[in-house]
Amino acid sequence: MKHAEMTGQIIGIIPARYGSTRFPGKPLASILGKTLLQRTYENSLRASALSDLIVATDDERIFEHVRSFNGKVVMTSEQCPTGTDRLAEVLSLYPEWMHATAIVNIQGDEPCLNPLTINLAVQALVNDPQGQVSTIVTPLLDEEEAKNSSIVKCVMDQQGNALYFSRALIPSNKTNSFKNGAIYFRHLGLYVYRPSFIINYQKLPSTPLQLEEDLEQLKVLEHGYRIKVAIVDQANIGVDTPEDIHKVEEWLCKQNTFL
C-alpha cells in the first residue's frame, strides 16, 4: 500500500457486520482457506491510492479475526443504522483523519474488487476540488439485469456527475423497453467521501426520492450535492448469499492472482 500521485491521506474503511438476513456470519465465511473479510481486506491493500486501511465492526468475533491476520480494526457501536454512520464513528475515534483528502467506503463482501477500481474512484474525487462524493458505475448490457430492481442504475451528465439513481430502467423510453445500443450503467457500491461531508451527511434529513427508491445516495443529490462518477469495464462478483461463495471461488481459481 502506497500513495498514488495524489495529495494527502486516503483512508480506506471496511464496515463489517456479523448479522445478515440472507447470510448470517458472512464476513467470516471461508473462501479457499481464507475468510471473505480477509480476502477483501488483503485485496484492498493492493490499491496504491490508500494510505491506510481499517475494518470497522460491532462484533467481537470479527474484531478478533481481523487482529489474527494482523489487520487494522476498530470496534464501533451496534447502534449505527448505516455504513455511513459507521464511517462517522470511525472519524470520531481517529480525529486526525478529518484532515485526510478522502475516505473510501469499501464493501466488506467484495473480495474480487479490482484495486484499480478503488484508485479510479479516489482519483475522480481528487480531480474535483469542490466535489464531496465520488462513486463507480459499469456498463449494463443484459436486459434482465437492467430491469432487475435489485440492480441500481445511474444516469450522468456530460461532465460525469450523477443525475439520478434508480431501481427502474433508466434511461427509459415511451414503451419502457430495453434498447440494444442504448447506454445503461449499473451502480457499484463503492463510495469516496470528503471527511467533512460524512459528518454533514448525518445531519441531513431524509428525502422523498431517497425513501421511495430506498437509495441513500439520492439524499445526497436531493440536498444539492453532486456525485462524481467514474466508469469501469465490468462489475465485480460480490457475495450476497451462500451460493455466491462458489462463484467467487471459481473466479479466483481462473484469475490465479491472489490465492
Curated annotation (Swiss-Prot):
Entry GO CC: cytosol
Pfam families documented for this protein: CTP_transf_3
Single annotated GO MF: 3-deoxy-manno-octulosonate cytidylyltransferase activity
InterPro entries: Cytidylyl_trans (IPR003329), KdsB (IPR004528), Nucleotide-diphossugar_trans (IPR029044)
PANTHER family: 3-DEOXY-MANNO-OCTULOSONATE CYTIDYLYLTRANSFERASE (PTHR42866), 3-DEOXY-MANNO-OCTULOSONATE CYTIDYLYLTRANSFERASE, MITOCHONDRIAL (PTHR42866:SF2)
Family membership: Belongs to the KdsB family.
The name this protein goes by in its record: 3-deoxy-manno-octulosonate cytidylyltransferase
